[in-house]
């Protein structure tokens, strides 16, 4: 039996992360891994969900400082990791997360311009060496992702940002995934059926490696 794992799905708005999380959970269960939970960042605990609303609400008359946004993201992340993710892993439950710390490097780092060194210091200060066992990065062009996101009923504060912001965020993603061999890049610009099959192929290949 494979030890419980922490799997993260990353990508821009409209990349299909929610669908991918459900897809990965289904694949795991089809391969006799029954104890699997889904979480999202920020969110998935009472405190973290309140922080999520604070971050995403676009009705505030006061703009967020970029450092404020980063710290709020990490406050929610720490709460989720300590309260839900780590306890679940210790009990043998697999965890699939919609976003993790790579999002902060991409959004607050690449998009908002906070230095990578500062973000990493914050990460190691509170989460030490806690890292995902596997990250799937769904790569989508910002123009395509935002068009998909715009079909939703309501765009949040971050989704309202400029195309330039998301281009910088994607560039940061592409730069950072080259530094981590545990990150798998999947083209999310394609038809959802093709993307789903590619996700399945990568997960099955990864599971085989873990069994061996």
Curated annotation (Swiss-Prot):
**Signal peptide range:** none
Which InterPro entries does this chain map to? P-loop_NTPase (IPR027417), Thymidylate_kin-like_dom (IPR039430), Thymidylate_kin_CS (IPR018095), Thymidylate_kinase (IPR018094)
Which reactions appear under catalytic activity for this entry? dTMP + ATP = dTDP + ADP
Which UniProt key words apply to this protein?
ATP-binding, Kinase, Nucleotide biosynthesis, Nucleotide-binding, Transferase
Any one biological process term the GO annotation gives: dUDP biosynthetic process
Q: Which GO terms describe its cellular component?
A: cytosol
Which Pfam family would be a valid example here?
Answer: Thymidylate_kin
Residues binding ATP, per UniProt: 11-18
Q: Does this entry carry the keyword Nucleotide-binding?
A: yes
Q: Name one GO molecular function term.
A: ATP binding
- Functional note: Phosphorylation of dTMP to form dTDP in both de novo and salvage pathways of dTTP synthesis.
Q: Tell me the protein family, please.
A: Belongs to the thymidylate kinase family.
This protein's name: Thymidylate kinase
Q: Which organism is it from?
A: Buchnera aphidicola subsp. Schizaphis graminum (strain Sg)
Gene encoding the protein? tmk
